[in-house]
Amino acid sequence: PELIEICDRIGLLVNCESFDMWELPKTDFDNARFFRETAHRDVMSWVKRDRNHPSVILWSIGNEIYDTHVNEHGYEIAEMLKNYVREFDYKCNAGVTIGSNFIEWENSQKIGEMLGISGYNYTERCYDAHHKKYPNTVIYGSETSSAVRSRGIYHFPADVPQLTHDDHQCSSLANSTVGWGKPAETAWIDDRDRKFCAGQYVWTGIDYIGEPTPYSTRNSYFGMADTCCLPKDIYYFYQSVWTDFKEKPMVHLLPYWDFNVGQPIDVIAYTNAPAVELFVNGRSQGIQHIDHEHG
């Protein structure tokens, strides 16, 4: 409750999620063993706890759910859970949705259509075709990007993808991505250029312990900030697209400059300004105007 109260105060929109599995298990001893017995009670507790919070805009009945694509029984479960949610959120304070890795399967698409609000995990490639097929279904990115980066680490050149490195760190030059993800700038454009898309939830805001990616490390590298909540460079990309130049002008330049003498380095500037001029030792290196087409 404390987390959602903070979101209420500062204006963060919450996709409030319940189940990580339904009847089909992900591990030997997970909640699938009790799902059918406890689902109604779990939904009641979940919805009644959070239904009066203005920050909650979505009730997600699951994420990465195996049942949704293997057969039509998943549709029946999804409809059951939707009805449970509506039983306790009878004023429809928030919509009912699901986050899906399996949206390319017909059964999963039908569930999204039935719910009316469908979350897509890393499947922006389906947006246009599915919007044409299901024009009345709201589409949004329930998980996007999954670019990995270490704060203050740069592996050159920027145009060479490299997920791992000898130092076991990830590059902050937008050239470290996992197989299922994409750079933050690309994921942003996928959403920005589609008026029918309701937005996206970026994976992730903050690094977290577990899911070591790349393996083997102690934690993930997905965050805009590290585990101490210190901003990485990509934090300033999101600041540049979420703020107004006329109200809060900003620019963030990377990387730092004390590399080996004579080593070519890639320079990146994140800004909400229409143009940026780069100076080295007082000498102009030219002006770059913002490229809206490519972010």
Q: Residue ranges of each PLM-predicted region?
A:
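Active-site mouth of glycoside hydrolases
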Residues: 1-117, 121-138, 143-157
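Substrate-binding clefts and catalytic carboxylate motifs of secreted carbohydrate-active enzymes
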Residues: 55-59, 78-94, 99, 110-112, ...
